[in-house]
Swiss-Prot record:
Pfam families: AAA, AAA_2, AAA_lid_9, Clp_N, ClpB_D2-small. This is ATP-dependent Clp protease ATP-binding subunit ClpC. Residues 163-410 are annotated as: I. Gene3D superfamilies: 1.10.8.60, Clp, N-terminal domain, P-loop containing nucleotide triphosphate hydrolases, UVR domain. Residues 417-452 form the UVR domain. It comes from Staphylococcus haemolyticus (strain JCSC1435). Residues 471-662 are annotated as: II.
Length: 824
């Protein structure tokens, strides 16, 4: 907290506040202790103003002890509560508004008055202090000394009126204490001071990625000037932040912009104590240069070269390269200073420096573990932004979320409010109907409810009081999960059970294939428990096997179990990438080609959904160059698109399916179903497919894959299970049209028999169901049979399929409603 600007009396107030907290055995210094501290300084303006309202020290002590009482024996260091910190911030704000250079007891009192929550506010309410009159009394007691300060400030800057209207004086803002502290940038600030102290071309330009803290360095320089931590050459200088948009705004006629900029330059030259700071320096190039007029950069060049104008610029690497470097004459007038992204450790130090500001704003406590989690998790999971900006935003949003959650009006208050509104409407209706006795009863009921509401509200506020809400590591995880979709919160019991039973969930959709299901499930559990390699994808797999055994279906089932819907899967059909030139569509077209601005089909989807299942279907159909792109994805977990953006694949499950070797198996008569024993068949299939896989793909590609799984052929029993699954899906579809079908076991066996094909796996079952069930049902409907609201029983008598139409839930077949397959 910024206590350097407090008067001696105000500092004594804070010391008294600490003593009062110790006397009352409280573990924190709150607003009530600040109030007691004010009362301990009877000669201060604050105490005198309160005394004029008949508020004495004894009364305040009595109220405080009544409201919160004495605590237990307190140990350790005393800390200010977030609300007390907010009061100090408000008191500084009051001093700035009154143009006072220091914070006194009167400003602390104004801060307490503005902070309308907390124990001090309740003490004022209990002692019937009129807040508006008290504030007016403080301002009156101050008299007019502030006007002299105001005039002094005005006189200091009245020699630069144009500049003052277009720029912000960072040194004045730093003096007011409203700039955030700058942590860990001493090296860069020293380098800026060295360049500014040169005789000519003394213009540093801060170059770095967005969000690394370039503007903060200029603010740090302003704070160093205010604190006299600069060489003699820079003492007394003013750092003015100029926005080129403001300079251009309103210049309707030719020459107005140039005249305005020239006037600013003349004022800076005459004042001799101004350092100009231009954020987004690249906006100089072309600014005000419409219709052949000279732009801002060309107007400033002579003054920049001669050293008449000291300018600090800030811009990103890309903008510097595109706008500044192409103008060699402008580039040589600036000295580049590289501002690198801070490390995670440096970011934690920066967050600790900013903690007080965010605690005071959100009125919560921010723990060290929350700061560390914000730095580490944002570094790990938010790959398209830079530290410390993304970590600061994370702390800010998480603090806001916690604050709002803890201060939401409880349900019982909302219910009483609704009841009051209801009674009020009934009372108005009774008055309108001239039922005055009923209206009087309702009025009494309303009064009773309003009293009940006030009591409940006061009780809720009392429990809230100065109770400190803390920001934890879990809160940070929740917010970053909301940003990215990656689950980072603590695993709860429900999710734990779901992960442990993932195999069973997948088996509900994928029949057989235990090896594949187990391998996938283990990879997902490793990732969710935080044990996976942080630099690689969650898992990468190649699924081999003949067609129709469930390779693609397993990927769909995994997407549904992880995200609740199949559409969450990113599917890339590799048959679309058979030509060499089509490979670029994955990462985006190169510059100069059509579609460069659209991004890649794969990279754009993963950028938007970094936590996903990616299915590369039928990989043997793709051009070999595709697998060169996948090498770095499998090994390093990232891919760079054509715009130079790094796309993070570390939170994806990569599944590749292939039928490689299936043709050779068919030639060997081992594909599909039947043949020798199950074990012998599987080993032959496995050896053949692995051999073909090694012939088709490079070893460096296969070596990067976590697991290569050969799918088993499907047995007849498994086929029957698949038929049951397919029939259930059909039943669900038909139930939406109020048609209920029942397929008997005999019919299912016949469908499985008809759909049995050693070459094509389970896919012929779809055709068999279409032929035996869907086609005949559609003919029944078109033939005039009213089957809506009825039950259709599909059976097989050994020769043909039979369709019995029953009344729903009747259980008795109507003799005249039996239809054979041939009749249908």
């Amino acid at each position: 907290m910024l206590f350097g600007r407090l008067t001696e009396r105000a500092q004594r107030v804070l010391a008294h506040a600490q003593e009062e907290a110790i006397r009352l055995n409280h573990s924190n210094i709150g607003t009530e202790h600040l109030l007691l501290g004010l009362m301990k300084e009877p000669e201060g303006i604050a105490a005198k103003v309160l005394e004029s309202f008949n508020i004495t020290e004894d009364k305040v002590i009595e109220e405080v002890e009544k409201l919160i009482g004495h605590g237990q024996d307190q140990t350790g260091t005393l800390h200010y509560t977030p609300r007390a910190k907010k009061v100090i911030e408000l008191s500084m704000d009051e001093a700035r508004k009154l143009h006072h250079n220091f914070v006194g007891t009167e400003h602390i009192l104004l801060g307490l008055i503005r902070e309308n929550e907390g124990v001090a506010a309740r003490v004022f309410a209990n002692l019937d202090l009129n807040i508006t009159k008290a504030r007016a009394q403080v301002v009156k007691a101050l008299g007019s000394p502030e006007m002299s300060n105001k005039n002094a400030t005005a006189n200091k800057s009245n020699n630069t009126p144009t500049l003052d209207g277009l720029a912000r004086d960072l040194t004045v803002i730093a003096k007011d204490g409203t700039l955030d502290p700058v942590v860990g940038r001493d090296k860069e600030i020293t380098r800026v001071i060295e360049v500014l102290s040169r005789r000519t071309k003394n213009n540093p330009v801060l170059i770095g990625e967005p969000g690394v803290g370039k503007t903060a360095i200029a603010e740090g320089l302003a704070q160093a000037i205010v604190n006299n931590e600069v060489p003699e050459t820079l003492k007394g200088k003013r750092v003015m932040s100029l926005d080129m948009g403001t300079v251009v705004a309103g210049t309707k006629y030719r020459g107005e912009f140039e005249e305005r900029l020239k006037k600013v330059m003349e004022e800076i030259h005459q004042a001799g104590n101004v350092i100009l700071f231009i954020d987004e320096l690249h906006t100089l190039v072309g600014a005000g240069g419409a219709e052949g007029a000279i732009d801002a950069s060309n107007i400033l060049k002579p003054a920049l070269a001669r050293g008449e104008l000291q300018c600090i610029g800030a811009t990103t690497l890309d903008e510097y390269r595109k706008n500044i470097e192409k103008d060699a004459a402008l580039e040589r007038r600036f000295q580049p200073i590289q501002v690198d992204e801070p490390t995670v450790e440096d970011t934690i130090a920066i967050l600790k420096g900013l903690r007080d500001r965010y605690e005071a704003h959100h009125r919560i406590n921010i723990s060290d573990e929350a700061l560390e989690a914000a730095a580490k998790l944002s570094d790990c999971y938010v790959s398209d932004r830079f530290l410390p900006d993304k970590a600061i935003d994370l702390i800010d949003e998480a603090s806001s979320k916690v604050r709002l959650k803890s201060h939401t009006t409880p349900n019982n208050l909302k219910e009483i409010e609704q009841e009051i509104e209801k009674v009020k409407n009934e009372k108005d209706a009774a008055v309108h109907a001239q039922e005055f006795e009923n209206a009087a009863n309702l009025r009494d009921k309303q009064t009773k409810l309003e009293k009940q509401y006030e009591d409940a509200k006061n009780e809720w506020k009392t429990t809230q009081g100065d109770q400190s809400t803390s920001l934890s590591k879990e809160d940070i995880g929740e917010v970053i999960a909301g940003w990215t979709g990656i689950p980072l919160t603590k695993i709860n019991e429900t999710e734990s059970d779901r992960l442990l039973n993932l195999e069973q969930t997948l088996h509900d959709r994928v029949i057989g294939q235990n090896d594949a299901v187990t391998s996938i499930s283990k990879a997902v559990r490793r990732a969710r428990a935080g044990l996976k390699d942080p630099k690689r994808p969650i898992g990468s797999f190649i699924f081999l096997g003949p067609t129709g055994v469930g390779k693609t279906e397993l990927a769909r089932a995994l997407a549904e179990s992880m995200f609740g819907e199949e559409d969450a899967m990113i599917r890339v059909d590799m048959s679309e990438f058979m030509e060499k030139h089509a490979v670029s569509r994955l990462v985006g077209a190169p510059p100069g080609y059509v579609g460069h601005d659209e991004g890649g089909q794969l990279t754009e989807k993963v950028r938007r959904k970094p936590y996903s299942v990616i299915l590369f279907d039928e990989i043997e159909k793709a051009h070999p160059d595709v697998f060169n792109i996948l090498l770095q994805v499998l090994d390093d977990g990232h891919l760079t698109d054509t715009k130079g953006r790094q796309v993070d694949f570390r939170n994806t499950v990569i599944i590749m399916t292939s039928n490689v070797g299936a043709q050779e198996l068919q030639d060997q008569r081992f594909a599909g179903f039947g043949g020798g024993s199950e074990g012998h068949d599987y080993e032959t299939i496995r050896k053949t497919m692995m051999k073909e896989l090694k012939n088709s793909f490079r070893p460096e590609f296969l070596n990067r894959v976590d697991d290569i799984i050969v799918f088993h052929k499907l047995s007849k029993d498994e086929l029957k299970e698949i038929v049951t699954m397919m029939v259930n899906k059909l039943t669900q579809r038909l139930s939406e049209q109020d048609i209920n079908i029942v397929v008997t076991d005999k019919a299912k066996e016949k469908i499985a028999e008809e759909g049995y094909d050693p070459e094509y796996g389970a896919r012929p079952l779809i055709r068999a169901i279409q032929k035996t069930v869907e086609d005949n049902l559609s003919e029944l409907i078109l033939d005039g049979n009213q089957i809506e609201g009825k039950e259709v029983v599909i059976d097989h008598d050994g020769d043909e399929f039979k369709y019995n139409i029953n009344e729903k839930n009747n259980g008795i077949s109507d003799e005249g409603n039996e239809v054979t397959e041939t009749e249908a």
